[in-house]
């Protein structure tokens, strides 16, 4: 699925013009972005702040796919991130997101950011359903 990230002028759209998304299996979704030079830092790799933004924004479409609920709306309660390797600006960046637990109001998520076989970061997050 090709997902346009919000209306023109919003942070989400400015940061990531589009994301690709698909289900890998019943509990796991893959969200892909294509980094550009504007996502880089002074060292010529993907900026850590951009990685954090992608983790946060990529969880939303992943949760919609995994739950099958296109009307799902969540807010981030908590995120824990471990930076493992630098991200290459020339390669697509995938967020592989797994729903580990769902309750009436909460979604418990684990994920990995990857470029091919390289792990860029790992994360866990708690999302609160607001509708």
Locations of regions flagged by a protein language model:
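Terminal targeting signals and extreme-terminal segments of soluble enzymes
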Residues: 1-131
């Amino acid at each position: 699925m090709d997902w346009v990230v919000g209306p023109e002028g919003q942070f989400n759209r400015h940061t990531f013009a589009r994301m690709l998304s698909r289900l890998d299996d019943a509990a796991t979704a893959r969200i892909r972005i294509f980094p550009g030079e504007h996502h880089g830092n002074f060292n010529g790799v993907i900026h850590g702040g951009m990685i954090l933004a992608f983790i946060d924004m990529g969880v939303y479409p992943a949760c919609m796919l995994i739950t099958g609920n296109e009307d799902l709306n969540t807010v981030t309660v908590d995120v824990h991130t471990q930076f493992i390797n630098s991200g290459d600006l020339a390669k697509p960046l995938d967020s592989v997101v797994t729903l580990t637990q769902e309750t009436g109001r909460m979604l418990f998520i684990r994920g990995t950011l990857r470029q091919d076989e390289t792990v860029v970061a790992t994360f866990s997050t708690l999302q609160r359903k607001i509708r």
